[in-house]
């Protein structure tokens, strides 16, 4: 019985020892695997901690970048508003400059027309001054003629006065001779009186007739001379009045033309001053437009440079953040 039991127990013990050894081996291998798994878990936990830290950092950076993007968008919107305002102001300035240029062209045309009118007025004034000089010369000639005729009238009046005086003297002489004859007849006798009376009757009528004829002729001549003098004086009075009226008209026309010339010169000066003012204003507007265009170009260059510098989507940091976030998403999906 004992031998049979021993024979039956020995293989069982051997089998049990083999199983123990295999179990020990398995336990050792399991312990080693457990250590490896624990090391892996520790490393994975460390990696996850690092990943979570990197994720938080990436989220912070993403938030900061989002804030910066919002700020940049606001700045861009403000810059766009400023650009729109500056472009509208530049367009207004250009419209005002066009208006000023049109006004300048109009004022130039007005100045040219006023200058042409002033030149024509000056030519008219020169022509009128020449006409006035001619009229003054003719007036002087007429005045000389009038003075000459006045001298002639004075001479005729003197001749009339001398002839009247000579007539009176002749009459007085005739009366004196008659008195002397009558006195001589009264003193002499009757015979001589008869002879003298006969002589007087023969001579005196003839002498009286001749004297009367001469006196009548002289009176007619004097009357004709008086009529001629009156006609000449009236004619030359009318001529002098006409010349004086013409002279007054010429003087008035000359004064009116001088006033017109002064007005045209004043208008020309005003037009020149307005053109100078408009030119200065145009130059100022051109300078302002140039400054605005320079500012706009500078702003555009700055914005382009800042856009190139701050292009968020092409930066390496953004690419790193995107790659880290993709890696985190892959790890979470594997879990």
UniProtKB/Swiss-Prot annotation:
Main localization is nucleus
* Ranges annotated as spanning the membrane: 312-329
Q: Where does this one sit in the cell? A: Nucleus inner membrane; Nucleus, Nucleoplasm
Swiss-Prot/TrEMBL keywords: Coiled coil, Membrane, Nucleus, Transmembrane, Transmembrane helix
- Keyword check for Secreted, yes or no: no
Protein topology in the membrane? Single-pass membrane protein
- Motif Bipartite nuclear localization signal per UniProt: ranges: 239-260
Regions annotated as coiled coil: 55-85, 125-260
InterPro entries per the UniProt record, alphabetical: NEAP1-4
- Return the GO cellular component terms, semicolon-separated: nuclear envelope; nuclear inner membrane; nucleoplasm
How it assembles, according to the record, is: Forms homomers and heteromers with NEAP1 and NEAP3. Interacts with SUN1 and SUN2.
Name of the molecule in the record: Nuclear envelope-associated protein 2
Please give the organism.
Arabidopsis thaliana (Mouse-ear cress)
Quick one: which gene encodes this? NEAP2
